[in-house]
Amino acid sequence: AAGLAAVLFDMDGTLIDSEKVWDHSLVEVLRWLGGTDLSPAARRETLGGNLPSSLAIVFREAGVEQEPELAEKAARLLVEKTAELFEEGLPWRPGALDALRTVRAAGIPVALVTNTGRYLTDKALVGIGAEHFDVTVCGDEVPRGKPAPDPYLRAAGLLGVPVADCVAVEDSPTGIRAAETAGAAVLAVPCEVAISQGPGRVVLDSLVGLRVEDLAAVLVRVREDSRA
């Protein structure tokens, strides 16, 4: 695959169908705070977000002041609930496992780049398989999580490849912004919200039947767009 240095996969909503798990946990915390349910707009806001940003949305929705002690308890509850659900096993997104295997078989470096913290990511990796990845970068291991470019820049740095020669596979506007800001080409595979075509990305319905040639073509197309 000419020019393709690495493939950087997001986790939640891209490889595994875990956005619903997060949603369930966030609603539990919201109810613990005295709220009832997340509004559709708030749900969209939490997609691809990290723990602090999602918690802030839950507190806002509950109409409760985010005092340090209460916020700490809420964060613990959110992690505990999510960990329980992660341990039950997470379903793969369509075509995701085959896509990972295809890239690995071609000898192309692979990174997992997620806004989820290390503790929960390691729980998810029990089911996903850590062996699929050369490196994993978590939201609590960088100064700023997505939508900031830090996670993608760190992943490319750990792999020792230029980020501009990488394709990031993402499902959320938050993650896409992070990857595009970092300078990676983006293959967007929408999960919970629609993603529009744009100059820095190619949008596909799913990862089913994905070939290395398709990923290389994403890189070529994005480079052409940037020169246009």
Model-found features: residue ranges?
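Generic anion/oxyanion-binding catalytic loop in active/binding sites
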Residues: 43-44, 85-88, 110, 141, ...
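N-terminal helical cap/lid subdomain that shapes the substrate entry/recognition surface
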Residues: 2-106, 119
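Conserved SAM-binding loop
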Residues: 15, 92, 110-113, 144, ...
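Residue-level detector of short coil/turn "hinge" positions at structural boundaries
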Residues: 37-38, 66, 110, 132, ...
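Intrinsic disorder/low-complexity signature
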Residues: 47, 109-112, 137
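Asp-based, Mg2+/Mn2+-dependent phosphohydrolase catalytic module
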Residues: 1-5, 101-104, 117-228
